[in-house]
Amino acid sequence: MINYIKKSLSLSAVITGEMATDDCQRLESLKNRLKGQFGVPVGVHMTGIPLAISTLLTIFCYAMLQVSVWMLLFRLLGLPEFKVMMGVFLAAVVYCMIVMSTMFLTARGSLTGYKLHISVITLTGLMSIVYFIWTWISLLFGSVENYTPQITSLLGLGFFGLNIVWMNTSVFYRSIALTLHNRVWRKQLKIENRQMAGLKR
């Protein structure tokens, strides 16, 4: 079901391990292997769009449960509800900073960044599942005047599902292979520049 996600994680782990060398020939060989993974040099996977779409879907999924969660939290703590929007805003800023950081790390070919990106998506997805169950139980066993929580919980679950489907495509997999290729390339260039600087001395 999530074969491409597993493949991209496995590829990232293998390349990260094999990058631990200063041999430019081995790095060139790694680059060539990765070129075979991301395929044709022109396509959506070359633009960074796949990772950006995944990030946006994660943010949309999180946004769907924000207001209801903060309303519930403020009621439990006995805080005035007019301050809810302040809580929503601050939490959204922190969340966006976290998810954007994982996106940029993933775009640089970082295995840790990619694992964190998947962890953030998984955690957000679990929150949306809990929110979905809670809102629909409230609808079935309680008196509900406003159906907004049920609609937003359904949308949140939809965004989470779309994100998983999107990350499990060959386009997304090839975009991860490209980020790894570029990371290897950057390391190769650094080594070559260092060697050139040594020769000039």
Report the location of each language-model feature:
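Alpha-helical membrane-associated segments of multi-pass integral membrane proteins
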Residues: 128, 135-187
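Generic alpha-helical transmembrane segments
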Residues: 58-66, 80-101, 123-127
